[in-house]
C-alpha cells in the first residue's frame, strides 16, 4: 500500500478556498470526441446519425448517369482492423490507418416510352474497397509515415447572416453605409449594401452590384407586394368639404408632431396643442376621449407616396399608381372625383427613410422573368440567356441543397438573428429569409437593431479534426462522382459491377494530402507532456478557408469579452501569429455546432446551486454572471447585497437576486499552460504569456522533480497527456521490471473478453519528434494494489504522477560580479555535478542501400582503404554495436556503392595492382556521425525486403523481440491458470468425490467417497480435473467444466494473438521501391547544463547561463549552505512579474518544512511529534484524518517523501495570500521577510544587505547551445551563385553582408576584403588554386572573377543588353 500513500494528492498542501464543483474535462477530448463523431465506429451501421463520414456519403450518393437510367446508391461503410499497431507504425515509418469498405448498390432502370414511368431492371449490391483512413491514437494524434502529427482545430467565421457598416470610410462625406452578408457553409455569398445615395444594392458572389429589388423580383414579388412588405401605410379620409383626416394609428403616431390642435369633439377641450409631440400619455388620452381621426392639412399630404393604385370610382382608370408621389394636381383630382379614402406610405425620413422606395424607382425591371434574365446576364456575361437556363441558375444559387448548404449552424444563426422559425434541417435559404435579411438591414439603417461583431465567439466557430476531414472527404467524393458519371455514360451499365465504376484513388489522394501537407496538420510538438497537450488544444484562425497573417488586423487578434472561460487571453505566440493562434481554456468544450462552451453554476433566487450548465457565447448574452470568488455564506447565498458581475461583456454591480449564473472556478479563464503558473495573478500579462510559452519548451530532465510550489494542475496534465501509464483495471501487481508491469486483475473487474491480466510494456528510451527522450519508469512494487486510473509508471517530465518540467533550486536575488547583467544567470557547479539539469537527447540516423543502375549498394564492414581502428565498433554486418561511444566522423553503418568505369590515374592503377580489383570499382558511402554529435549508440533497427536474406544482426534483434513476446505470453497464461486453479480449489476442496480417479500407473489418486484435499489435486494434472465428480452436487461439476473450458479458450486466444505477432516479426518489411535494406541507428546524447544554455522560470523570467561558478565561490548562508543560482534583482521591477518573488517565499517555506521533517527523522523523533508537526503545517481536516490513519512504517514513508520539501499548491487567482506565506515561513522557522544574510564565497565577507533567498522552479529550455554552435571549413556551395550555403542544417558559412563590406572598407582592409569576396566565397577557379597553393606550402593569392559577377552579366544579357568583358591593357 506504500505506493498509494506516497502518491496521495493530499500531500500537496492546497491554498484554494473554493471547493471544486466539477472536474476539469479530459484535456484532449476536443480531438477524441470530434474524431469519434466523424467515424461513428461504435455505432451500429443502421443507427448511425447523419453526421461526419456518414453525412458525406449520403450527400454525394446516389450518383445517377446523365440519362437517368442507372443510379449508384450508398448503403453503409465499415472499417477493418489496422495492418500495423501504433508501435509498429512508428518503427516502420507507416501510417496508422484502417482499410475502409463501402457497400454500394447499383440500380439499373427500364425507362418506358411514357414520360415519368420506369421499372427496375437490375439491382447489384457489393462491398468496394475504399482506401485507408487514418485512425486516431488514444492520445489524440495521428501517425503519418511513422511520425506523430496533430490536426489543429480551426477557428473560422460561422455561417449565417452578418450586418456591418463601413464606419464612414467608403465615401468622402463620411456617411455610414450599412451592409448585410449571408455566408453559407458552402455555396454563393449574398451581399446587400447601401450606397451614399441610400439606394440598396445586391451582389452575388462579390460580382457587379445591381439594385436589390432585381433579386426580390426574381423571387416572384411585384412592386406593390414589396412596397407594402417594407413600409406601413396610413389611411387618409377626405371629408365632404375637402378637409382631410388620417386614422390615428398609435404605433405610427409616436414621435410625430401634431400639425393642428387636437380637440375632443364632445367637449371642445384641446388635448394636444399644435407642434407638440405625440407622447405616450397624449396617445393614451386621445384613445380615452375616443378620438380616432386626426386633422391633416393638404400641404402634409402633398409629397406623400401612394401605397396602392388609386382608381377613379366611375371609370375604373388609375389616377395615381402605387409608389407614385402625390402632387397638388393629383390630390385635387382625387378630391374632385369624390374618392373618400386612400392610403399613403408612412415615410417620415427620420425613423423610416425612403431608401427602398428610391431603389424601386431606379430599378427599370418590371417582371420576374426579366429579373431572372438580368441576374443570368450579370453572373454569366457572354452566355445567351434563355428563361429556362436563367431559372435553373437562380434556383441552383440559393435553393438547391446540392449547391448551397447553410449547415445546421448557419440555419441556427439565421433563425436567431432574424427571429424566424424555420426547421434546423432546412439547410438552404427560403424566400422569406431573403426578405427578412433585407428588412433587418433597412431597419438597421433606420436606427433599430445592432450590427454584428465578427470577433464575438457567437460568430466564430471551431472546426475540429472530424469536420476538417469531412470537408476533405467531400472534395474527394465529388471528384470521384464526376469520374463515375462519365464511366456510366461511356459503358453499358447493365454489364458492370459497382467496383468497375468506383475508383477510390481521388478520395485517398485528398485525405493523404490533407494529413501530409495541410497547414492544419502539424508535426506534433513533443518536447514535453505539456507541449503535447497544448498542441492538441490549440485553435488557429489560419489555414484553408481562414485568415492570412498579412490580412488579419488588430481586432481579430485582440482579446474579446466572449473569450472569458472559452479561449485563453494569455497564451498565444509572440510574433506575426499573435492573437491568431489561441488555446482553449481549461474548462471549455466544443458543442455539436462547433461553438466553444464554458460551464457556469446555476443561481436560483440568490442561492448558488451545484447544478452546472454549459453556455456558448450567444446563450450567455444578457445573463448576469458572478465571479467564482464572490463570497457565499454556508447556505449558499451571496454574502453581499451587491455583487460584481459580468453582463453583456461589461463589469457591473448587480443585486444578488438578479444574478443567474456563477463561474465554476477562478482558473476557468485561462488555458492549461497558464494555469500551471503559481501566483499568475501577480504577473504582468506580457510576462505571463512568455511564461506559458516557455513551459512548453522545457526539456525533460534526467531526474524529474515536481514543483514544490505548484497550482494543482500538474497531476491533471500528467494524467491526460498520455505520457504516464494509467492502470486500466483494479488489481494486484504480479511482477515489475524496468520494461514491463504485470497486473493481475481483481475478479470483480473481469470483462467478457478479458484474460484477467493486464500487461503494460513500458516505453524505454524512445525518440520524440523533438529528439528528446521518452522513457517510462515504474512507480509500483510487487504486491501493491492499484485502482483503475492510478498512475503506475512515470513518463518523461513526470514525477509521482505529477508534471515535472524543471527543478526546485535555491535562488538568491543579487548582482554578482556582473555575471548576471542583462538577464544572464550565474549557476553553481553543484547543479552540473549532481546532473540536476542534465537531459538526454536521442538522434536517429538512417542508411539506405538501394539498387542503382551500376549495381546494388551493399551494407558491409568490408570497406576499402579503412584501417582496423576505424572499423573496430562495426559487427560483421557492417552495423555499429550497441553501447559504442561515437564522435563526429565515426562510421555508424558501413556501405559501399558501385562506381562507374572511369579512366584511372597512375596512382589508382598502382593501388589496383597492389590491392586487387575490389578497391577500385566501389566507393565508400558509409553513414557517418555528423559534426556536433557525440554520444552512445542505444539501438539499431534493420528493415529488409521481403524474401531477402537476413544478416546475423537482424536475426539477433528478431530473437530478442521474440523472447520478449514469448515471456509476455507465458506470464499471461501462468496468471490466468493460477487464478483458475484458485477458483477450482475453492469449488472442490472439502467436497466428497463421487468417483475414484486413478493415475496412469493405476494408482488411486482420489478414492471414491473421500473428501478432496489440496494434496490430492496436486498429485495429477489440472487438465484431468474435469473427470472429478462431486457427490450430491451437480452444479459443482458444471462450474468446474465451465471454468476449465473458459481457461482453455483464453489460452487459445492468447496463443493466437502472440503467434500472429511473431509471424509479423518474421515477415519482411514493405520498403519503398528500389530500396534493398534500411538501417536506423539511434544515438543518445547526454547534455549537461553549460554556458550558453537558455533557462527560465515560470513567470517569463528567462536568461542565458553566463558562468558556472565552483560551489565554494557561490554566496552562502549562515549555516554554510551555498545558493545554487544567482539572478539579477533588476529583472523584476520593470518586468512586473512579482509572482516569482511570492513563489520564492512560499518555496522557501516549503523547503524549510522539509528540513524540519528531516531533523525529526534524523533524531528518530516520536511518531506523535511528527504527526503534530505535519498537522500544524497542513492545517487541513482531511489531511488530519489521513495522518491519523497512518502508523509506523507508513508514516515514515510519508515523512521521507516530504523531506525534500512540503509540496504546495497555489491555484491561479485563488493562491496563497501574503498572510498565508508569512505564517508558513514562521512555521518553517524563517524570517517572515523571506530574506537572509549571505556571505561572499570568495572572501567570506558578509554582504552589506540582507538578500531575498528562496526556492524557485527553474526550467532548462530547448534552446541548447550545442544545437546552435556551428563552424564550417569546406562545405557545399549554391549551384547558381557558387557561394557557400547558409545555416547549420546545410553546413553553411557565415554571411558577409552589405553592411559588413562597408565596415571592412571603412577600415581600409582592402586585401582582407578581396579575399572574402573572391577565394573564400564564389571565385571557383581562385579557390581551387588557393587549395593547391596551401597543399604545396605556398601562400600566394590569385583572385579571379567571382561567379556572382557572371550571374549579373547573364541577367543583363537576358534583358537584351549586350554586355561583354573586354580583356586588354589598362590604358
Curated annotation (Swiss-Prot):
Report the Pfam families cross-referenced here: RNA_pol_Rpb2_1, RNA_pol_Rpb2_2, RNA_pol_Rpb2_3, RNA_pol_Rpb2_45, RNA_pol_Rpb2_6, RNA_pol_Rpb2_7
Query: GO cellular-component terms in the record?
Result: DNA-directed RNA polymerase complex
Q: Which organism is it from?
A: Geobacter sp. (strain M21)
What does the record give as EC number? 2.7.7.6
Which InterPro entries does the UniProt entry name for this protein? Answer: DNA-dir_RNA_pol_bsu_ext_1_sf (IPR042107), DNA-dir_RNA_pol_bsu_external_1 (IPR019462), DNA-dir_RNA_pol_su2 (IPR015712), DNA-dir_RNAP_su2_dom (IPR007120), DNA-dir_RNAP_su2_hyb_sf (IPR037033), RNA_pol_bsu_bac (IPR010243), RNA_pol_bsu_CS (IPR007121), RNA_pol_bsu_protrusion (IPR007644)
Do you know which CDD domains this protein is assigned to?
RNA_pol_B_RPB2 (cd00653)
Q: Which NCBIfam families match?
A: PRK00405.1, rpoB
- PROSITE patterns registered for this protein in UniProt: RNA_POL_BETA (PS01166)
- Function text: DNA-dependent RNA polymerase catalyzes the transcription of DNA into RNA using the four ribonucleoside triphosphates as substrates.
Q: Which UniProt keywords apply?
A: DNA-directed RNA polymerase, Nucleotidyltransferase, Transcription, Transferase
Complexes and interactors: The RNAP catalytic core consists of 2 alpha, 1 beta, 1 beta' and 1 omega subunit. When a sigma factor is associated with the core the holoenzyme is formed, which can initiate transcription.
- Coiled-coil intervals: none
Q: Which family does it belong to?
A: Belongs to the RNA polymerase beta chain family.
Query: This chain belongs to which protein, by name?
Result: DNA-directed RNA polymerase subunit beta
Q: Give the reactions, separated by semicolons, that this protein catalyses.
A: RNA(n) + a ribonucleoside 5'-triphosphate = RNA(n+1) + diphosphate
- A single BP term in Gene Ontology: DNA-templated transcription
Q: Which GO terms describe its molecular function?
A: DNA binding; DNA-directed RNA polymerase activity; ribonucleoside binding
Amino acid at each position: 500500500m506504500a505506493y498509494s500513500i506516497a502518491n496521495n494528492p493530499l500531500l500537496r498542501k492546497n491554498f484554494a478556498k473554493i471547493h471544486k464543483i466539477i472536474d476539469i474535462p479530459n484535456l484532449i477530448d476536443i480531438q477524441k470526441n470530434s474524431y469519434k463523431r466523424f467515424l461513428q465506429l461504435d455505432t451500429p451501421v443502421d443507427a448511425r446519425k447523419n453526421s461526419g463520414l456518414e453525412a458525406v456519403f449520403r450527400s454525394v450518393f446516389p450518383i445517377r448517369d446523365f440519362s437517368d437510367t442507372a443510379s449508384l446508391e450508398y448503403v453503409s461503410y465499415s472499417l477493418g482492423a489496422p495492418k500495423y499497431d501504433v508501435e509498429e507504425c512508428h518503427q516502420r515509418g507507416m501510417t496508422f490507418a484502417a482499410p475502409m469498405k463501402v457497400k454500394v448498390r447499383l440500380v439499373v432502370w427500364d425507362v418506358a416510352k411514357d414520360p415519368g414511368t420506369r421499372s427496375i431492371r437490375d439491382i447489384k449490391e457489393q462491398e468496394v474497397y475504399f482506401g485507408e483512413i487514418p485512425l486516431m491514437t488514444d492520445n489524440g494524434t495521428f501517425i503519418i509515415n511513422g511520425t506523430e502529427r496533430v490536426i489543429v482545430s480551426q477557428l473560422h467565421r460561422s455561417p449565417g447572416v452578418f450586418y456591418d457598416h463601413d464606419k464612414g470610410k467608403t465615401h468622402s462625406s463620411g456617411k455610414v453605409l450599412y451592409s448585410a452578408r449571408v455566408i453559407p457553409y458552402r455555396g454563393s455569398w449574398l451581399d446587400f449594401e447601401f450606397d451614399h445615395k441610400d439606394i440598396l444594392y445586391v451582389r452575388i458572389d462579390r460580382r457587379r452590384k445591381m439594385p436589390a429589388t432585381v433579386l426580390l423580383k426574381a423571387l416572384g414579388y411585384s412592386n406593390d407586394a414589396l412596397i407594402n412588405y417594407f413600409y406601413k401605410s396610413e389611411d387618409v379620409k377626405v371629408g365632404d368639404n375637402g378637409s382631410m383626416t388620417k386614422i390615428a394609428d398609435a404605433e405610427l403616431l409616436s414621435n410625430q408632431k401634431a400639425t393642428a390642435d387636437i380637440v375632443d369633439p364632445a367637449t371642445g377641450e384641446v388635448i394636444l396643442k399644435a407642434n407638440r409631440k405625440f407622447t405616450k400619455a397624449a396617445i393614451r388620452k386621445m384613445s380615452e376621449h375616443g378620438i380616432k381621426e386626426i386633422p391633416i392639412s393638404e400641404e402634409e399630404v402633398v409629397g406623400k407616396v401612394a401605397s396602392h393604385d388609386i382608381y377613379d370610382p366611375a371609370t375604373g382608370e388609375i389616377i395615381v399608381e402605387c409608389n407614385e408621389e402625390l402632387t397638388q394636381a393629383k390630390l385635387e383630382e382625387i378630391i374632385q372625383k369624390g374618392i373618400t379614402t386612400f392610403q399613403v406610405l408612412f415615410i417620415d425620413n427620420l425613423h423610416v427613410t425612403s431608401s427602398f422606395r428610391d431603389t424601386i424607382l431606379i430599378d427599370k425591371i418590371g417582371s420576374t422573368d426579366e429579373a431572372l434574365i438580368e441576374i443570368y446576364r450579370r453572373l454569366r456575361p457572354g452566355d445567351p440567356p434563355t428563361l429556362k437556363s436563367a431559372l435553373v441558375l437562380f434556383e441552383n444559387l440559393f435553393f438547391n441543397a446540392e449547391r448551397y448548404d447553410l449547415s445546421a449552424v448557419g440555419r441556427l444563426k439565421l433563425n436567431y438573428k432574424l427571429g424566424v422559425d424555420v426547421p434546423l434541417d432546412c439547410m438552404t435559404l427560403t424566400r422569406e429569409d431573403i426578405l427578412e435579411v433585407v428588412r433587418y438591414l433597412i431597419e438597421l439603417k433606420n436606427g433599430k437593431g445592432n450590427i454584428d461583431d465578427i470577433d464575438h465567439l457567437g460568430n466564430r466557430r471551431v472546426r475540429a479534426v472530424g469536420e476538417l476531414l469531412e470537408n476533405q472527404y467531400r472534395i474527394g467524393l465529388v471528384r470521384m462522382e464526376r469520374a463515375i458519371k462519365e464511366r456510366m455514360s461511356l459503358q453499358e451499365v447493365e454489364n458492370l459491377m459497382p467496383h468497375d465504376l468506383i475508383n477510390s484513388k481521388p478520395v485517398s489522394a485528398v485525405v493523404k494530402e490533407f494529413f501530409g501537407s495541410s497547414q492544419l496538420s502539424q508535426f506534433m510538438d513533443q518536447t514535453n507532456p505539456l507541449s503535447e497537450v497544448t498542441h492538441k488544444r490549440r485553435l488557429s484562425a489560419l489555414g484553408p478557408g481562414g485568415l492570412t497573417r498579412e490580412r488579419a488586423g488588430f481586432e481579430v487578434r485582440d482579446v474579446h469579452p466572449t473569450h472569458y472561460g472559452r479561449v485563453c487571453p494569455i497564451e498565444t505566440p509572440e510574433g506575426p501569429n499573435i492573437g491568431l493562434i489561441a488555446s482553449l481554456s481549461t474548462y471549455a468544450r466544443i458543442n455539436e455546432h462547433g461553438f466553444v462552451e464554458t460551464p457556469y453554476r446555476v443561481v436560483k433566487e440568490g442561492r448558488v446551486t451545484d447544478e452546472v450548465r454549459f453556455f456558448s457565447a450567444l446563450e450567455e448574452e444578457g445573463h448576469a454572471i458572478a465571479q467564482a470568488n464572490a463570497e457565499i455564506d454556508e447556505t449558499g447565498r451571496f454574502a453581499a447585497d451587491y455583487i460584481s458581475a459580468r453582463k453583456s461583456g461589461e463589469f457591473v454591480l448587480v443585486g444578488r437576486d438578479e444574478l443567474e449564473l456563477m463561474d465554476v472556478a477562478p482558473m476557468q479563464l485561462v488555458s492549461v499552460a497558464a494555469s500551471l503558473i503559481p501566483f499568475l495573478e501577480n504577473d504582468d500579462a506580457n510576462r505571463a504569456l512568455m511564461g506559458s510559452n516557455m513551459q512548453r519548451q522545457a526539456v525533460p530532465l534526467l531526474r524529474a522533480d515536481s514543483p514544490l510550489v505548484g497550482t494543482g494542475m500538474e497531476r491533471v496534465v500528467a494524467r491526460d497527456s498520455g505520457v504516464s501509464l494509467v492502470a486500466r483495471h483494479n488489481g494486484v501487481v504480479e511482477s515489475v521490471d524496468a520494461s514491463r508491469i504485470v497486473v493481475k486483475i481483481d475478479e470483480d473487474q473481469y470483462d467478457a473478453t478479458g484474460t484477467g491480466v493486464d500487461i503494460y510494456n513500458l516505453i524505454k528510451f524512445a525518440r520524440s519528434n523533438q529528439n528528446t527522450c521518452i522513457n517510462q519508469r515504474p512507480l509500483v512494487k510487487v504486491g501493491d494494489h492499484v485502482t483503475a486510473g492510478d498512475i503506475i509508471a512515470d513518463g518523461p517530465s513526470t514525477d509521482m504522477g505529477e508534471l515535472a518540467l524543471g527543478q526546485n533550486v535555491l535562488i538568491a536575488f543579487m548582482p554578482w560580479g556582473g555575471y548576471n547583467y542583462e538577464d544572464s544567470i550565474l549557476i553553481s557547479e553543484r547543479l552540473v555535478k549532481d546532473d540536476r539539469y542534465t537531459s538526454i537527447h536521442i538522434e536517429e540516423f538512417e542508411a539506405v542501400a538501394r539498387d542503382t543502375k551500376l549495381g546494388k549498394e551493399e551494407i558491409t564492414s568490408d570497406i576499402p582503404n579503412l584501417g582496423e581502428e576505424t572499423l573496430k565498433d562495426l559487427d560483421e554486418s557492417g552495423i555499429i554495436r550497441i553501447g559504442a561511444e561515437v564522435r563526429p566522423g565515426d562510421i555508424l553503418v558501413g556501405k559501399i556503392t558501385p562506381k562507374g568505369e572511369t579512366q584511372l590515374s597512375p596512382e589508382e592503377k598502382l593501388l589496383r595492382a597492389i590491392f586487387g580489383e575490389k578497391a577500385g570499382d566501389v566507393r565508400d558511402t558509409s553513414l557517418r556521425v555528423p559534426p556536433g554529435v557525440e554520444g552512445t549508440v542505444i539501438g539499431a533497427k534493420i528493415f529488409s525486403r521481403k524474401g531477402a536474406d537476413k544478416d546475423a544482426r537482424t536475426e539477433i534483434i528478431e530473437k530478442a523481440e521474440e523472447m520478449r513476446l514469448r515471456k509476455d505470453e507465458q506470464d499471461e497464461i501462468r496468471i490466468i491458470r493460477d487464478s483458475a486453479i484458485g477458483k477450482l480449489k475453492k469449488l472442490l476442496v472439502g467436497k466428497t468425490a463421487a468417483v475414484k480417479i486413478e493415475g496412469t500407473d493405476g494408482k488411486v489418486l482420489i478414492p471414491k467417497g473421500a473428501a478432496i484435499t489440496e494434496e490430492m489435486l496436486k498429485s495429477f494434472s489440472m487438465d484431468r480435473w474435469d473427470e472429478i465428480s462431486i457427490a450430491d452436487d451437480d452444479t459443482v461439476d458444471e462450474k468446474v467444466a465451465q471454468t476449465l473450458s473458459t481457461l482453455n479458450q483464453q489460452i487459445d486466444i492468447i496463443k493466437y494473438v502472440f503467434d500472429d505477432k511473431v509471424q509479423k516479426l518474421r515477415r519482411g518489411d514493405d520498403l519503398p521501391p528500389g530500396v534493398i535494406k534500411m538501417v536506423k541507428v539511434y544515438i543518445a546524447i547526454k547534455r549537461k547544463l553549460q554556458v550558453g544554455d537558455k533557462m527560465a522560470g515560470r513567470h517569463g523570467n528567462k536568461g542565458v547561463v553566463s558562468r558556472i561558478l565552483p560551489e565554494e565561490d557561490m554566496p552562502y548562508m549562515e549555516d554554510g549552505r551555498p545558493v545554487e543560482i544567482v539572478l539579477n534583482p533588476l529583472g523584476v521591477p520593470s518586468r512586473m512579474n512579482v509572482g516569482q518573488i511570492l513563489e520564492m517565499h512560499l518555496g522557501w517555506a516549503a523547503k524549510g518544512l522539509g528540513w524540519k521533517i528531516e531533523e525529526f527523522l534524523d533524531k528518530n523523533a516520536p511518531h506523535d511529534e511528527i504527526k503534530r508537526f505535519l498537522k500544524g503545517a497542513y492545517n487541513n481536516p482531511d489531511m488530519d484524518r489521513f495522518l491519523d490513519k497512518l502508523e509506523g512504517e507508513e508514516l515514515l514513508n510519508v515523512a521521507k517523501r516530504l523531506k525534500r520539501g512540503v509540496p504546495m499548491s497555489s491555484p491561479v487567482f485563488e493562491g496563497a495570500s501574503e498572510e498565508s506565506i508569512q505564517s508558513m515561513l514562521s512555521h518553517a522557522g524563517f524570517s517572515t521577510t523571506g530574506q537572509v544574510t549571505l556571505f561572499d564565497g570568495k572572501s567570506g565577507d558578509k554582504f552589506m544587505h540582507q538578500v531575498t533567498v528562496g526556492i524557485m522552479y527553474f526550467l532548462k529550455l530547448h534552446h541548447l547551445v550545442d544545437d546552435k554552435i556551428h563552424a564550417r571549413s569546406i562545405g557545399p556551395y549554391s549551384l547558381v551563385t557558387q557561394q557557400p550555403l547558409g545555416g547549420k542544417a546545410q553546413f553553411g558559412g557565415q554571411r558577409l553582408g552589405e553592411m559588413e563590406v562597408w565596415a571592412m572598407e571603412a577600415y581600409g582592409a582592402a586585401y582582407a576584403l578581396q579575399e572574402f569576396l573572391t577565394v573564400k566565397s564564389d571565385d571557383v577557379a581562385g579557390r581551387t588554386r588557393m587549395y593547391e597553393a596551401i597543399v604545396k606550402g605556398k601562400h600566394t593569392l590569385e583572385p579571379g572573377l567571382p561567379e556572382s559577377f557572371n550571374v549579373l552579366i547573364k541577367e543583363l544579357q537576358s534583358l537584351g543588353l549586350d554586355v561583354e568583358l573586354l580583356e586588354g591593357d589598362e590604358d
